[in-house]
Amino acid sequence: MKREEIAEARDRLAHQLPNPAQIVRGSLLRRTIRHRRGCPKCQAGGGHLVWVLTVTYRGGKTRQFSLRPEQRAQVRQWVRNYQRLKRHLEAICELNHQLLWPAE
């Protein structure tokens, strides 16, 4: 690939980056909460469905954010945006590495 083509490919990727204000790192998980006693639904084996955003930090510390049902779609999109941003940044870095090679 020629240097001009590499630069154009990099610029195309840069224009496709999602809005950084609409990203979140983590995993969206569905969990079932069961109360130990006093809840007929839990005693029947059903439990309560909840959605959480799980984020693992440096050092192995994990944090979970409980989500309201109306937040699920937004958080799912933000997680996808983060994954897309990460993929695009890696691709841009690879193209920039190629631009650092001596011209042939």
Model-derived segments and spans:
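A positively charged, amphipathic N-terminal helix/segment that binds anionic biomolecules
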Residues: M1-E104
